Amino acid sequence: MASARTDPIPTSQPEPEAARQAGGEQPAIRAAGLAKSYGPTVALAGLDLHVAAGETVALLGPNGAGKTTTIGLLVGLLHPDRGQVQVYGRPPSQAVAGGLVGAMLQDAGLMPGVRVGELLAMVRGLYPRPLPPGELVALADLGPVLGRRADRLSGGQAQRVRFAVAIAGDPRLLLLDEPTAAMDVQARRNFWAQIHRYTARGRTVLFATHYLQEADDAADRVVVIAGGRKVADGTPAAIKARFGDQQVRFTLLQGSPALLAALDGVRAVDRDGPRVTLRSSDTDATVAALVRSGLRWSGLDVGGGDLETSFLRLLAETS
């Protein structure tokens, strides 16, 4: 397999750094040429990453792409072999020590034998200007479990406690590494509602996730890394427009499904019973060909592809 291309594929018109940082505000994250290896294994191979203050950015990539390593560098737990990284103009360790950064890391443990309310009080005491206790509990939706032991919660409840611990100091930047991995669908929806309430305060969020629908719904911008490098950077809509086939969906009432693949613009045909989805490079041409085909159909709908399909095509094109 060929090595991953080194230049990120543009997915939107670049926005000047000066425009993003109007008023002279420091960018939340500025990283250039980050390289990190673990013995012979290369985790990052020259990653550049800029995140403006107030943005919500999703960090996507296949397993082993370097997402967790990137977050480890941003919280100062790791040090790059090469390259530079600053968080609000400071080295990451100084930004963390100054209370500017909160983080939810994968598999972070919770103190055994301590009740949730006690844990939150202890964590708040570590910061000079913590969130008020009532606001912290409300943001993390922890009221019903304050009296329970932190080590006896469900996976989703424990993640909400980790979220509360991460925001207890009212950080300007919140780093999330697979934050909803232990949650069911409803718990994930509730969690992102909590994140939206937090970002409404002007806070910055960078999150890594394997749930691409979360990135589509929650992120202002998506950064895709593969092979330790950035391969795409743009809004979810821009990435879907660049890499995702448009779709023509309808119910096939009569006619041979074999004719569908030959319609103009059709790249692939997906069927779920009588419901058909045509992935098309030119939906106008596909619809016109469908009308001329003699097939009987109903319930026509034309729309964009999803971020997951775009992500898979992007990875295929950059490997």
What are these regions (language model features)?
Residues 149-156:
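Conserved ABC ATPase signature
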Residues 192-281:
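ABC transporter nucleotide-binding domain
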Residues 75, 83-97:
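Conserved ABC transporter NBD signature motif
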Residues 34, 121, 125, 131-146:
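Conserved ABC ATPase "signature" region
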Residues 174-178:
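Catalytic Walker B motif of ABC-type/P-loop ATPase nucleotide-binding domains
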Residues 29, 44-46:
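Conserved structural motif at the start of ABC-family nucleotide-binding domains
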Residues 2-12, 281-319:
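C-terminal coupling/interaction segments
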